[in-house]
């Protein structure tokens, strides 16, 4: 048995045993050690290792370290085990045997391999900069035995462990339904609804998370021309390695209404399941292929039958919905510790639904075109009727007649409003008698290409070119509703910062005079993967599509020997390549105090610096840095100076976004200069819609340095609005960069650094955002060498 990944500390001790504790005012200081500390770069290294089929085929059984730590993750692997706790590597000294056995430190895996494969597996892990070592052995004796410091501290029979402990009993009483819970009242107007917390936009929260990583997001969290219609599902391509393509995707959605669950846990949970599946249907999936997983969170139950009645009712409601839909829940999580002093959480059951789908069949929710009929698909109040309505909708979708769809969540009015936001396409109702503010469990609103012959439902109205929503006697402009909707949580999750002034559009028409004298039919690109890098696969895919052979070199820093070997391997690769591409990510976790410090320190190694300068100055090579890679190029001096040098206060740099948080969305960039081999296939004024994802992307420079860049044609790209005008508006310029600068060249154009992730593209990527997403940068680089 091999332990793989992170080291073990006191973080997480008590995580499982204390998962149902009630906290108090002292918990923050007395129970902090029970909280696990995540390490995303370490987890990603494990992902890289497990994508190697030759490695995973060595594994007979494996387990992730979760609740219970070693005692569970390893203890579950086989009936008989001898576990050596002294072998478990620690974050620090002082842990006793029990702490080593139950710590829930994160980013650890336990794997079982054949004895003859152990060294091979460990060597493969070390190639990915991971620690891996033997900690236990499988035995014939059906006992779990733990040793620590020469003592046997646990010796338990498997028969005893398999009993799962003593039988437990609880008394349950299902109370009266509390229809007044939270004082839920229907909204009276569109403006009131748009201003409510219930329907508020979560964009300021969502943009803190990378929505485009992996170049596999079929849907971005917000879509449409204005990126304002929220996606109800997460749709993603199955991950494949560079050189492979797929159109197979999965869609996942959730359902939960705390108000409904508080009023009636049974009905609330039932509706949560129905809503989660309805969202899949609205995205184009077949509900018959859906599976579920449930998460529950309830107040501390104590020994009170009334409290026990809430999860009892909720689980019964969820089970009934599963039986009606023939959709099974596989796995899940629960916690019964939602009480703090005299406060209790509302009964919470979240249903997550997932289904397979072809990426080209995914329906996006934003209205597409004016003049289209809009229908609501309604059952007859029974499960059979609901499924019939879904099947009717699905048939129209397969016939190509559905342009947009939304599963009704809070009200019909909310659905129409949010479908209108993305492209500012208006809506006008046809019937004044419709109750627009009622909820409709399982109902789906759809924009159709034509009037259907027959549907399980009713016509609601038509889309309009005028950006106004009219529901009977209630009417409001879309931009006003959107402003109200995004303003609800502005103080908590801000979306606005800086000014909205316009800046100059930079244009440098002159082409680069640089000529490649060392021609090759298929250039080679070296892609270093530093600790924290997360875009090397996407970058390699972009290279392959452009006719470039990528070589990913993993930089290992676990030991001094690994670091030295990595430097030698990278130097060798650079001297054999035609280009170096520094991919995006968060090298070293962007610590301490700023991004790309580890990359810069590593590349300042004299041998590596010499190899890079030889590539650029003597072998006609090229260099590209994207996002984290751009940060490294700037801090090394490769842009804008074209050489590795010591930087000072007179030099440009990249710093924290003006809004003070991570930004993830799509932006429009304009080609400002083509004075680089990287721009051979681009023209000044070309507009591209590409994703950004960074916390430190704000380009700043002293006024003289900025003026010199502009005067010498070194500003390659600018952030612009939909009409191609550079601006300081945060919706245009997401980080507040000086002169809306997105990318810059070295003086000869051989080195290009930019923030936007142009490599994150594909025919099924971000289908809910319009625009030209293919910037032929890699193709230009390949053309330069031919």
Short names for language-model regions:
Residues 33, 303, 592-600, 717-718, ...:
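Short, basic, glycine/proline-bearing loop/turn elements
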Residues 66, 335, 587, 629-631, ...:
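Catalytic metal-binding/acid-base residues of hydrolase active sites
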Residues 563-565, 569-570, 611-614, 646-786:
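Amide-donor transfer/coupling interface in amidating biosynthetic enzymes
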